[in-house]
Amino acid sequence: MLKPYGNRVVIQKTERETTTASGIVLTDSAKEKTNEGTVVAVGTGRILNNGERVEIGVSVGDRVVYEPFGGTEVKTGDESYIVLKEEDIIAIVE
């Protein structure tokens, strides 16, 4: 498992459906890229100039929407994750 550093979070992307409601199977190039996923790990937070630590505002298990081009894709074994900074998270899905 990945352990993010500082104000970074690890997200497991939510995959889009590969078949439309009418039964058409989409190829990888036809699928719309998703920018939604589930937080699987959070860093320790950002450290301010005065040494104070600011905790990250999301928790493991939160479903989030993030900037479409934010973060770095990391593969470990068969799993693929996005590691991004907390400020690249747009919203928590409730």
Curated annotation (Swiss-Prot):
Location of this chain's protein in the cell: Cytoplasm
Keywords from the named record: Chaperone, Cytoplasm
Family annotation (CDD domains): cpn10 (cd00320)
Pfam families referenced in this protein's UniProt entry, alphabetically: Cpn10 (PF00166)
GO cellular-component term (any): cytoplasm
InterPro entries named among the record's database cross-references: Chaperonin_GroES, Chaperonin_GroES_sf, GroES-like_sf
A Gene Ontology molecular function term of the record: unfolded protein binding
One of the protein's GO biological processes: chaperone cofactor-dependent protein refolding
SMART domains for the chain: Cpn10
Family statement drawn from the similarity comment of this UniProt entry: Belongs to the GroES chaperonin family.
Record text on subunit structure and interactions: Heptamer of 7 subunits arranged in a ring. Interacts with the chaperonin GroEL.
Function, in words: Together with the chaperonin GroEL, plays an essential role in assisting protein folding. The GroEL-GroES system forms a nano-cage that allows encapsulation of the non-native substrate proteins and provides a physical environment optimized to promote and accelerate protein folding. GroES binds to the apical surface of the GroEL ring, thereby capping the opening of the GroEL channel.
NCBIfam families: PRK00364.2-2, PRK00364.2-3, PRK00364.2-5
Name listed for the protein in its UniProt record: Co-chaperonin GroES
Source species of the chain: Macrococcus caseolyticus (strain JCSC5402) (Macrococcoides caseolyticum)
Top-level taxonomy: Bacteria, Bacillati, Bacillota, Bacilli, Bacillales
